[in-house]
């Protein structure tokens, strides 16, 4: 669906923040995908929860704007998002794409950090 409209140039279509797609990246996005949760993105949700991304599970929320200092959360509690080596396990441990993908999107991990879905394997 996305490749054809991008090729035709009639509409600007792009594959959203739903995981790394390997060789298809250039066909469906303008840049390589890498989850930016906690790197360049942070979210404050309606209830005040501070999350590295609005799409991440609630057990990954790192604080609350009504109780915690946002800068402290950004600088200290988001550290696991910035060093993704902990994600290099299971299928990711031997994947040739890990250096680009960095373990896929945080919203695709369970509460123990296990990958629930690898978009690359689905292709």
Name what the model sees in each region.
Residues 1-58, 98-100:
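A C-terminal junction/extension of Radical SAM enzymes
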Residues 55-123:
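Flexible mid-to-C-terminal extensions adjoining Fe-S/redox cofactors in radical SAM and related proteins
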